[in-house]
């Protein structure tokens, strides 16, 4: 496995900043290793061990589990003081998670997880050091994506998907003490 992670924070002006985190990853099984894919073997039971054993596969060359080749989180933030004396902070965030394989078996039926891209927007008004209100739109484009999946965790030959949250529009009141 090899990769590169880049973290960058830049102040573009007195009130505008850019925060960028990028990850590049190349993951691959480089040695011979035989594994059983429980998705393929679930129908064989006691007395059929030889059939199960015959279904083993060499995973050399397969992508490691849960290792997207590319991830990005780019955030631009604008901060200023309003004429009223209140503070204003606006944040726009871009998040990209590349495709990956859920398990080292790389079974195309259950292991391929698609890439997704989402955007988040937040505006905050600070009335004092202890009181603020936030207006948020998360997953602005209402992207339907899969964060993760789990295959055959309980031996029932099923795959469960963990979805990313849909678009959310929220208001939050913050009080610090």
Where do the language-model regions lie?
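Short, local alpha-helical segments
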Residues: 103-107, 115-120
